[in-house]
Curated annotation (Swiss-Prot):
Signal peptide: none annotated. PANTHER family: EXOSOME COMPLEX COMPONENT, EXOSOME COMPLEX COMPONENT RRP41. Belongs to the RNase PH family. Gene3D superfamilies: GHMP Kinase, N-terminal domain. Homohexameric ring arranged as a trimer of dimers. The gene is rph. Its EC number is 2.7.7.56. Keywords: Nucleotidyltransferase, RNA-binding, rRNA processing, Transferase, tRNA processing, tRNA-binding. InterPro entries: ExoRNase_PH_dom1, ExoRNase_PH_dom2, ExoRNase_PH_dom2_sf, PNPase/RNase_PH_dom_sf, Ribosomal_Su5_D2-typ_SF, RNase_PH, RNase_PH_bac-type, RNase_PH_CS. This is Ribonuclease PH. It is an enzyme of class 2 (transferase). Pfam families: RNase_PH, RNase_PH_C.
Length: 241
């Protein structure tokens, strides 16, 4: 029933998705992605260098950084730079974003250069990491297209599309794309990263209250597949615009 969710959405319904390319001027790729009221700025920057462990190997690197503006949430948080270090949650999320994007790149075709995806949360209402992955992919494609047009690389290193969505069990019902009201009151929370071939790149699932059953897990994965399919279509529509 739609009235079982605070937003009134159906259990298998995404929030409205907006992917706006070219949001800032200077980066090779720049995307504002919105999952409902969650808004993340994703920029892709190209540098002609690689980490030390890759020097001389002819391979490129894709990495990510993640952060939230101080008032992205209901109350202001200090900037992590002011604290002198990144928090554990930040490190976990940016590593997830980096892993997810590396899964769709032929790093040999990229050559010895690094593409950094900076994902800055402007407004948080749940699902910031999944929105970041979904938007960062589009920014990555735009950056690669710049390299192709400049003749810096000879073949496209993008192997396929990647998108991510959250699913969870909210008041006994498996639901798709949790907002903050659901995420803060759910029994199970899971983030699912998939590619356009239907393969799973990463699954992060935790029982917040009661342990989830196998049938609930299967239902959640089914919802995630549906949601990712719709997000992949939104990415393609944005890239074709």
């Amino acid at each position: 029933m739609s009235d079982s969710r605070p937003s009134g959405r159906q259990p298998d319904q995404l929030r409205p998705v907006v992917i706006q390319r070219g949001f800032t001027r200077h980066a090779e790729g720049s995307v504002l992605v919105c999952f409902g009221e969650t808004r993340v700025l994703c920029t892709a920057s190209v540098e002609n260098r690689v980490p030390g462990f890759l020097r001389g190997k002819g391979e490129g690197w894709v990495t990510a950084e993640y952060g939230m503006l101080p008032r992205a949430t209901h109350t202001r948080s200090d900037r992590e730079a002011a604290r002198g270090k990144q928090g554990g949650r930040t490190l976990e999320i940016q590593r997830l974003i980096g892993r997810s994007l590396r899964a769709c790149v032929d790093r040999n075709a990229l050559g010895e250069r690094t593409i950094t995806l900076d994902c800055d949360v402007l407004q948080a209402d749940g699902g910031t990491r999944t929105a970041a992955i979904t938007g960062a992919y589009v920014a990555l494609v735009d950056a690669v297209n710049v390299l192709m047009k400049r003749g810096d690389i000879k073949r496209n290193p993008i192997l396929g599309a990647v998108a991510a969505v959250s699913v969870g069990v909210y008041r006994g019902t498996p639901v798709l794309d949790l907002d903050y009201a659901e995420d803060s009151d759910c029994d199970t929370d899971m983030n699912v990263v998939m590619n356009d071939g239907g393969g799973f790149i990463e699954l992060q699932g935790t029982a917040e209250g009661h342990a989830f059953r196998r049938d609930e897990l299967d239902a959640l994965l089914g919802l995630a597949e549906k949601g990712v399919g719709e997000l992949l279509a939104a990415q393609q529509a944005a890239l074709s615009a």
